[in-house]
Amino acid sequence: MDAFNPADSSLRINVAASGDTALVAEAPGKRIKVHALRLSAAGAVVVQIKDGSTVLETFNFPAAGTMPPLELRHAPYYTGTTNTALNINLSGAVQVDGRIEYTVA
């Protein structure tokens, strides 16, 4: 973690199943804060980022190759609730790739 990138963890997103998939597991007494997110879809799909079952943001990919970057590095873009996992939800079985940078504190 540094002044230009407060995130202390990152992971590759590689999801193709419709429905919820856990990105970051819940941690007892801690919150997940997302500092950067990049997504790319192989086809038309609606992607939701969720704090447990609560939708934080919805991205509508009308076609393959579109990509919404969220590159906010000094303040968290999303702050989850305590003891809650960060999930991704796909409206259909379409390959979605990307990267997420986050902290758990």
Model-inferred region functions:
Residues 1-105:
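Beta-strand-centric surfaces of beta-sandwich/beta-rich domains
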